[in-house]
């Protein structure tokens, strides 16, 4: 709260900001504080499918294949023997070991997988495999939490401040060119005061 109050105080007491910017500060705070949050929330829900009907109902799991049947006990055994090994590393090791097995060694697990698939078809005759889409990672500059009103306000005011300064600079140069265009030409007969005045305007 202290940072937000100090930011507001500095904005209202500064002479660099135009009256239009100061009048629009409450609107900026209301419209910008949750702008990124709302867009990210809607994008996150669309990408992960949180509101889809498929997630409300329990999804039917796929029947296990031969590799899954074989790896159930092997994964449990490897995890107990290597408690610090990551799950991804265990999967790599199991995949390598499965490839090293002969067809005769794999055959019992293929038979078990066929039995499980037959039981699955009887239990779920209308089952169709629908792979899930992986949820995309949210941008780093976007948060699901409400944005800090002070930071959003300061960023908006800084942008308007830059535009305001550019307008003031253009107006100043325009006035200087207009005044220089009305100055009398400098010649040898001009007085020292006229030459000093012309030199002063050209140096601005």
Curated annotation (Swiss-Prot):
Changing residue 62 to G: Strongly reduces nuclear localization. Strongly reduces nuclear localization. Reduces interaction with KPNB1. The keyword Transcription regulation applies. Keywords: Acetylation, Activator, ADP-ribosylation, Calmodulin-binding, Chromosomal rearrangement, Cytoplasm, Differentiation, Disease variant, DNA-binding, Nucleus, Repressor, Sexual differentiation, Transcription, Transcription regulation. GO terms for molecular function: calmodulin binding; DNA binding; DNA-binding transcription activator activity, RNA polymerase II-specific; DNA-binding transcription factor activity, RNA polymerase II-specific; DNA-binding transcription factor binding; RNA polymerase II cis-regulatory region sequence-specific DNA binding. Its main location: nucleus. SUPFAM superfamilies: HMG-box. Changing residue 75 to M: In SRXY1; localizes mainly in the cytoplasm. It is found in: Nucleus speckle; Cytoplasm; Nucleus. Changing residue 128 to R: Does not abolish acetylation. Changing residue 134 to R: Does not abolish acetylation. Residues 59-136 are annotated as: Sufficient for interaction with KPNB1. Residues 60-128 bind DNA. SMART domains: HMG. Residues 107-139 are annotated as: Sufficient for interaction with EP300. Changing residue 136 to R: Abolishes acetylation. Does not abolish interaction with EP300. Does not abolish DNA-binding. Enhances cytoplasmic localization. Abolishes interaction with KPNB1. The keyword Repressor applies. Residues 138-155 are annotated as: Necessary for interaction with ZNF208 isoform KRAB-O. One of its GO terms (biological process) is positive regulation of gene expression. Transcriptional regulator that controls a genetic switch in male development. It is necessary and sufficient for initiating male sex determination by directing the development of supporting cell precursors (pre-Sertoli cells) as Sertoli rather than granulosa cells. Involved in different aspects of gene regulation including promoter activation or repression. Binds to the DNA consensus sequence 5'-[AT]AACAA[AT]-3'. SRY HMG box recognizes DNA by partial intercalation in the minor groove and promotes DNA bending. Also involved in pre-mRNA splicing. PANTHER family: SEX-DETERMINING REGION Y PROTEIN (PTHR10270:SF161), SOX TRANSCRIPTION FACTOR (PTHR10270). Belongs to the SRY family. This is Sex-determining region Y protein.
